[in-house]
A protein has these predicted regions:
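Short C-terminal domain-edge/linker segments immediately following a structured domain
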Residues: 28-34, 65-68, 97-98, 116-119, ...
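Tryptophan-centric aromatic hotspots in well-structured domains and transmembrane helices
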Residues: 39, 64, 87-90, 142-143, ...
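Active-site-adjacent beta-strand anchor residues
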Residues: 35-38, 129, 175
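Soluble or luminal CAZymes and related metallo-dependent hydrolases
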Residues: 15-19, 110, 173-181
């Protein structure tokens, strides 16, 4: 479930909020594991677990370090202790709400960008607050778009252009960790999804989707 540039709005003011919730309701009984990206992650965390969105005065924009919080998690298998992750958002999540929920675990975290990867304990839902799916020039294109709009709360992208020179080709410094995340997640989904999908609701209800079945 992808993001959208609507994180500055209250959830109930997003035109498709009701449709978004209905998709999540359907997925909870029909989908083995769902990955949410950026606003999709914020919306799902709020609707499913009551995690509040926190509006930011300035956009978190650029490539930021994320520190592993669980070096033995299969989702981050192969990650270095520090992984770079692109971020591009005007909001975050209330970290106290995440910490207070026993169903949630923070897998990566950064001092500037906060949680970058969160998952449920059974991994039926994975929440990426950053953008490991971004291509090499995506942040550059977003920066040029926002500058053309005259947005004053968008800083120059952090740790992206060599020597902070926008005339130089940006560095694709997150590609290896992005590939690891997708491969780890898809391999787990492939290995553990039951042939009979009618078993999914029961497995999710019993929280039996985790690595104990891998």
């Amino acid at each position: 479930v992808t993001g959208a540039p609507v994180e500055h709005l209250p959830f109930d003011q997003v035109d498709y909020w009701d449709e978004f919730k209905s998709i999540l309701d359907w997925a909870s009984t029909h989908v083995f594991s769902t990955m949410y990206l950026c606003w999709g992650a914020m919306g799902a965390l709020n609707y499913r677990y009551g995690v509040r969105k926190v509006d930011l005065p300035e956009k978190i924009f650029g490539v930021f370090p994320q520190y592993l919080q669980d070096e033995y998690c299969f989702l981050t298998n192969g990650f270095d202790e520090i992984a770079l992750q692109p971020h591009s958002r005007l909001a975050g999540v209330n970290e106290a709400d995440v910490a207070a929920n026993p169903d949630l675990q923070v897998l990566t975290w950064g001092p500037q960008s906060g949680p970058g990867l969160i998952a449920t304990r059974d991994f039926s839902e994975v929440f990426a607050l950053g953008h490991w799916e971004y291509g090499k020039t995506t942040l550059q294109e977003e920066y040029e778009r926002d500058m053309a709009k005259g947005m004053s709360n968008v800083p120059f992208p952090h740790n992206y252009f060599p020597h902070d020179d926008p005339h130089l080709e940006p560095l694709f410094a997150w590609r290896s960790h992005a590939n690891l995340l997708w491969r780890n997640w898809l391999n787990w989904v492939y290995q553990t999804t039951p042939y009979d999908l009618t078993e999914v609701p029961g497995l999710r209800a019993e929280r039996r989707l985790g690595i104990d079945r891998f």
